[in-house]
From Swiss-Prot:
The modification Phosphoserine is found at S77. This is Glutamate decarboxylase 1. Its cofactor is pyridoxal 5'-phosphate. Residues 1-12 have a biased composition (Low complexity). Keywords: Decarboxylase, Lyase, Neurotransmitter biosynthesis, Phosphoprotein, Pyridoxal phosphate. Pfam families: Pyridoxal_deC. The gene is Gad1.
Length: 593
């Protein structure tokens, strides 16, 4: 990690009243956020941009205007210096208003403002409750209950327009019956948390409503993506300046890109002539790797039989000797080894494959090395933990999902490629209506032809904005904290009779895998009958957990092992007290099993 990482700015008003706001430095004043902080209780409101040319007096006046909200809940204002617009929250009868009454309808500005202010209030209330530990993680209902309708919440589509009042009810109920994945006690998935800066970025992204295929229609976002991808490649450790990459719809697609790039690198004729024109190719990945590698093998015409699984040790790491043996076996049988996937942070155990040893084997047999760091890539931001990915700089490609350990809102996944031009060559189709070569700007910034998609969502802005807000050091601290919580959990349960660890030793990542042993099974010798009973414990506790809605954690089997809990921590809001609560809740729900 570069030593030039900027330090977080310090505030001379650290002890100030949190309900008041002093002016921030000029670079922050560009955003309405300078006024948003004036009231904590009503929360943030999206208010547009403030022009950089505003005088200090003008900015002070705007902040004062926002402070009025503390004494009047009806005042919600947005002032842009170029038009002086000001909106007041008014009692509005939405039962007689419809979508056709909103902009671009004539005279639709006021109705639009009132409607959006109502939506923002719904969102802010949801955000506030998400961080309130007395709020449930979920209000669980079975599918048939939601399909049948819940207290006026009807999922069926209507032929005729419904009122904006009903639309607002639908907005509230959609959040009410969903899962609060940002709740500090939600541990069910690798992607958790609700970053406020990222949320602001996603709101702005949706408002801009553009596409990432050309600089022509997304100039700022395209440049942000290039700058961010370059920074990520540098953090991986690639010294060349001509690498490549793109943001994709998720880690599974990023992994698919890596296989496509490898195939095109060694057999470019496959693009025009198909798989019939190339030898019988095989791919290698660990038995603990993400299932997306096999999915990509099926989708790209290799076939799942030609995705060869490599044995792992008891910690879930690839055994290099088995990899080399299977490469030689495939060659002897007439297959052509093409690609090896090493995982940096497996989904279940959180294991890091020995990349250096795998890279040696790939170089020896001239194979493409991909590192799936979707889950573990965030550790590259930590000087304390990045050694776990030692050798990643030797990879030909890397998958890295900022929407996991870095807490970026879904979706945000990058495929990084060491060699420039492969993605373009592999996927380029030169659609004349998008990628005209005679545009008035440098068309090398039209990145859309590198993608297998045409339309591509803007995933970069929320990530870029978070990086600006936190700095590299902020992400480092966030990731270190999550790993410290995993260590805390492991130390708390490793020697207790109610719990049994799935594998020996401290976890490498935030994955802590364990069985809860109910009273009825403690001291019972291992046997098929005991394993069968133990297999049913985690699903029963999880069902009770979801019914109560107090917390969520995942479970699964692995190989011949009975169902166990897989605790993962990626939510910066989680604390030791939340870990304590989870353990107590598992004990409470499982004590009578």
């Amino acid at each position: 990690m570069a030593s030039s990482t900027p330090s977080p700015a310090t505030s001379s008003n650290a002890g100030a009243d949190p309900n008041t706001t002093n002016l921030r430095p000029t670079t922050y004043d560009t955003w309405c956020g300078v006024a948003h902080g004036c009231t904590r209780k009503l929360g943030l409101k999206i208010c547009g941009f403030l022009q950089r040319t505003n005088s200090l007096e003008e900015k002070s006046r705007l902040v004062s205007a926002f402070r009025e909200r503390q004494s009047s809940k009806n005042l919600l204002s947005c002032e842009n210096s170029d038009q002086g617009a000001r909106f007041r929250r008014t009692e509005t009868d939405f039962s007689n208003l419809f979508a056709q009454d909103l902009l671009p309808a004539k005279n639709g500005e006021e109705q639009t403002a009132q409607f959006l202010l109502e939506v923002v209030d719904i969102l802010l209330n949801y955000v506030r409750k998400t961080f309130d530990r007395s709020t449930k993680v979920l209000d669980f209902h079975h599918p048939h209950q939601l399909l049948e309708g819940m207290e006026g919440f009807n999922l069926e589509l209507s032929d005729h327009p419904e009122s904006l009042e009903q639309i607002l009810v639908d907005c509230r109920d959609t959040l009410k019956y969903g899962v609060r994945t940002g709740h500090p006690r939600f541990f069910n998935q690798l992607s958790t948390g609700l970053d406020i800066i990222g949320l602001a970025g996603e709101w702005l992204t949706s408002t801009a409503n553009t596409n990432m295929f050309t600089y022509e229609i997304a100039p700022v976002f395209v440049l942000m993506e290039q700058i961010t991808l370059k920074k990520m490649r540098e953090i991986v450790g690639w010294s060349n300046k001509d690498g490549d990459g793109i943001f994709s719809p998720g880690g599974a697609i990023s992994n698919m890109y890596s296989i496509m790039a490898a195939r095109y690198k060694y057999f470019p004729e496959v693009k025009t002539k198909g798989m019939a024109a190339v030898p019988k190719l095989v791919l290698f990945t660990s038995e603990h790797s993400h299932y997306s590698i096999k999915k990509a093998g099926a989708a790209l015409g290799f076939g799942t039989d030609n995705v060869i699984l490599i044995k792992c040790n008891e910690r879930g790491k690839i055994i290099p000797a088995d990899l080399e043996a299977k490469i030689l076996d495939a060659k002897q049988k007439g297959y052509v080894p093409l690609y090896v996937n090493a995982t940096a942070g497996t989904t279940v155990y959180g294991a890091f494959d020995p990349i250096q040893e795998i890279a040696d084997i790939c170089e020896k047999y001239n194979l493409w090395l991909h590192v799936d760091a979707a889950w573990g890539g965030g550790l590259l931001m930590s000087r304390k933990h990045r050694h776990k990915l030692s050798g990643i700089e030797r990879a030909n490609s890397v998958t890295w999902n900022p929407h996991k350990m870095m807490g970026v809102l879904l979706q945000c996944s990058a495929i990084l490629v060491k060699e420039k031009g492969i993605l373009q060559g592999c996927n380029q189709m030169c659609a004349g209506y998008l990628f005209q070569p005679d545009k008035q700007y440098d068309v090398s910034y039209d990145t859309g032809d590198k993608a297998i998609q045409c339309g591509r969502h803007v995933d970069i802005f929320k990530f870029w904005l978070m990086w600006k807000a936190k700095g590299t050091v902020g992400f480092e601290n966030q990731i270190n904290k999550c790993l410290e919580l995993a260590d805390y959990l492991y130390a708390k349960i490793k020697n207790r009779e109610e719990f049994e660890m799935v594998f020996d030793g401290e976890p490498e990542h935030t994955n802590v895998c364990f069985w809860y042993i109910p009273q009825s099974l403690r001291g019972v010798p291992d046997s098929p009958e005991r394993r069968e009973k133990l297999h049913r414990v985690a699903p029963k506790i999880k069902a009770l957990m979801m019914e109560s809605g107090t917390t969520m954690v995942g479970y699964q089997p692995q190989g011949d092992k009975a169902n166990f809990f897989r605790m993962v921590i990626s939510n910066p809001a989680a604390t030791q007290s939340d870990i304590d609560f989870l353990i107590e809740e598992i004990e409470r729900l499982g004590q009578d099993l």
